Each structure stands twice: as structure tokens, then as C-alpha cells.
Curated annotation (Swiss-Prot):
Optimum pH is 8.8. Ca(+)/H(+) antiporter that extrudes calcium in exchange for external protons. Plays an important role in salt tolerance. Does not transport sodium or lithium. GO terms for molecular function: calcium:proton antiporter activity. It comes from Aphanothece halophytica. It comes from the Bacteria. This is Ca(2+)/H(+) antiporter. One of its GO terms (biological process) is calcium ion transmembrane transport. It is found in: Cell inner membrane. Coiled coil: none annotated.
Amino acid sequence: MLNKNTIFFGLLLFIPISLLGHWLHWDEVSIFLTASLAIIPLAAFMGEATEEIAIVVGPTLGGLLNATFGNATELILAFIALKSGLISVVKATITGSIISNLLLVMGFAMLLGGLRYKEQVFQSEVARVNASSMNLAVIAILLPTAVEHTSNGIGEETLQTLSVAVAIVLIIVYGLTLLFSMKTHSYLCEVGEIDQQSSSAMESGDKIPEKKPEDVNLWFWLGILLVVTITVAIESELLVNSLESATESLGLTALFTGVILLPVIGNAAEHFTAVTVAMKNKMDLSLSVAVGSTLQIALFVAPVLVIAGWIMGQPMDLDFNPFELVAVAVSVLIANSISSDGKSNWLEGSLLLATYIVIGLAFFFHPVVPEIG
């Protein structure tokens, strides 16, 4: 019988195929497609590994682990692009990652989880704290852009200095959010047992047995997670190296590619993990994956890239394309609005996905930006 695992194991064949295509110098579109297909099962196995580890370390650290390993590939690829001077593509990928996590990943999680359970609940207190943190992230990238567009003759060096200062503030805030969620207010996030009980009570038909921490081989799954993460990074690099020529052949702009296409592929790990746990009625863990990844991109990855660009002599700053900022602000607004009550259903997931589609269409028809393409 054909099931999900059979399909994923079959897709693993695209790992050697994509590597072979790279060594044999296949056309860029073929390499792009095979690398994309190779990432799908890897993301699924990464999600399974992180979920197993989360059983041992708890939903808060598990969510952080999901977000960290999901964004590790993006961070590595961003460093490569930054070193190559592709500043605008790096910025587009940052904003695109925020948009896709809040709308696409969280939307699918709420939709598919809501189709299985009439209503799902999560900690509204944590949702409000995350909403405030995301608002800060919007402010942090909005103000440097506003300074650039409302000032006459501000120098690139001054703008980068401002961006580095803001980046330091964001990293400090990110550390404070970790302290809040894992130390001083960890009780707000440790809700795995509540979710499991509600899952057993609400689920009809076949029931998924809940594993206990002592049933999980932690070191085995850590090894799996390490191997899969390294392979994801290799495949993602193949994908990005072929991306420019492939998207040009497909008639896509670099702006659409950076904001929509790259984050969708790069966030495949978060997507699979968030949806999988949402379908098991673990919405707190699901949202900690999606929102936690968003906060890490905004409060950690972006600031680190700004500081790295400053060290490497690359003009990486927080002056973003105004249209990208509008899309980020809209995404944060609707995500905060939907998650504020601590409840979700399939319709709210549909609204998030509809917003993502509208934003995607806007970027698809957006005219070429000279410095991006």
C-alpha cells in the first residue's frame, strides 16, 4: 500500500540524481527541479527527528530546535549570497521567510489541523508576547528604511552603522525572548501534556499512541537530525546555484524568486513539522515552530547577517524595498489578529493562505526592481 513514508523514501532517490546532474553539468532547470524534490523527504525526516527529540526536551525547546535547524540552511545560504555580494537577494529572502512562516506554514497548520479537529487551542499569553516581538521586528526594519527614504544625502556608511546598532538591539531582544520562554515563564509553554489529553479526548477512530521520553532514543534521533541537516544544506546549495538561470528560463523575476520561491523551499522543514504536529492536535508546538522560526529570522538571522556584512565589508543594512515592508506588515497584522484569542480553526488557516496567495500574486506581477531584477 502506498503511504506517506513510501513516497518520502522514493523521493530520496532525487538526492543522488541531483548530485549526478551537478557533476554531469545538466541544464540548470533539471538540477533545480531534482534538488527541490530531494529537499521534500529530507524536510519530512527532519520534522520527524525534531518531533521525537521534542518528546524528550519538551515542546518549548523542541520548537526552538525545529526553528533553529529549519533556519540553519537559510543562514548558511544567506552567508554564501552575502559573500557573493547578492545583498538584495539576501534581503528579499529575509522578508520572504517571515511572510511564508506566518502565512503559508501557519496557514497550512491551522487548515489541516482544523479539518481534523473542530477547534484547536494554544496559549494566548504566549501568542500576545510573540505578537509584540513581531511588531518590534517590523518597527526595526521599517525605521532604517524610513530614514533612508525621508532623508536627503544620508550616506551608506551612516545607514549601515544605524543598521548595526539596531541589529545589536534585536539580538539582545531575541536573547530576552529565549530567557522568557525557557526560564522565567517556561510554564506558559510547557503544555504538551494538555494537548495530548485533548487529542485523545477529541480524536475518533484510530488513535496515535503518545510516546514517553524514556521511549525515545535521543542520541539516535540527534544523529539522524545532524545527517539530514547536512544533506539539506548540500541540496539547498545546489538549488540556489541553479536558481538564477532556472528562474530566468521559467520567466520569473529575481524579486519573486527571493521573496516567494526561495523561502518556500527553504522553509520546507518547518512546513512539514508544523503541519504534522498540528494534525496531532499539538498546536502549541506547531505555532512555536512557525512563529519561533519567524522571530528567529527577524530577531537573530537578519541582525547576524547585518553584522556579518559589516565585518566582511558588504553593504548589508536594514533598508528594505518598501513593497516588501508592506507585505511583511500585512502578514504580521493578520497573523497577530488570528492568533490573539488562543484558538484556531480551518477557516482561519484558509484566510492566512488566501493572504499569502494575494501577496504572491502581487510579487509575481510586480515590475522588475533595477537592483534586484
